């Protein structure tokens, strides 16, 4: 991947031996945006898990814009896509001043199960999305996503998320938002 750092224009590289072992690398704002939006909105009626940091300076607002993030949350709700969000305990406290209350309301309005984790589970701004058929490791601010489809890798990552469920505190999204707005 370091060999790709000099590339600034949007690009997609696919490295694969067969369908089960493909790796797709997306570089640049447009490629990252297209890949993440496609992955999140093409799985109607499915469930995904996301490990999501509370870094307010990340590329989400730069690449997508707050309005488009709210539209994405609405699309997830309308397509009945269920998100299992693993987020830091201070998620809303960090992001509401930056993205606004309406953004937070759109976040909890979608079909969402929230698991809170201590901040030390988020040492970087990299994030991870997992669907039944692929895992996506991404760093929006770094303008890169890596998509993995190997079954053994997916099983390992899904097992990690199952473990996180036993460690995390499951909260009601609406109650969590109300509590965060009071702070």
Regions found by a protein language model. Give the residues of each.
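Residues that form generic nucleotide/phosphate-binding pockets
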Residues: 3, 7, 35-42, 75, ...
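Residue-level signal for secondary-structure boundary elements
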Residues: 9-12, 44-47, 169-173
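Short charge-dense sequence patches
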Residues: 16-24, 104-114, 183
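Signature of lipid phosphatidyltransferase scaffolds
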Residues: 22-24, 146-183
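Intrinsic structural disorder
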Residues: 1-7, 80, 86, 179-183
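Short, charged amphipathic alpha-helical surface segments
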Residues: 1-22
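Hydrophobic protein-protein interaction segments
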Residues: 29-153
């Amino acid at each position: 991947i370091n060999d790709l750092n000099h590339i600034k224009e949007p690009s997609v590289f696919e490295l694969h031996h067969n369908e089960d072992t493909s790796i797709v690398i997306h570089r640049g704002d447009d490629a990252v945006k297209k890949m993440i939006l496609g992955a999140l909105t093409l799985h109607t009626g499915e469930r995904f898990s996301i490990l999501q940091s509370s870094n307010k300076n990340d590329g989400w607002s730069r690449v997508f814009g707050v309005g488009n993030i709210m539209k994405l949350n609405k699309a997830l709700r309308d397509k009945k896509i269920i998100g299992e969000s693993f987020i830091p305990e201070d998620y809303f406290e960090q992001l509401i001043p930056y993205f606004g209350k309406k953004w937070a309301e759109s976040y909890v309005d979608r079909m969402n199960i929230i698991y809170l984790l201590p901040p030390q589970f988020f040492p970087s701004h990299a994030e991870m999305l997992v669907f039944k058929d692929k895992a996506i490791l991404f760093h929006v601010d770094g303008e890169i996503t890596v998509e993995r489809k190997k079954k053994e890798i997916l099983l390992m990552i899904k097992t990690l998320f199952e473990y996180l469920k036993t460690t995390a505190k499951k909260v009601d999204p609406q109650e969590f938002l109300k509590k965060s707005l009071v702070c």
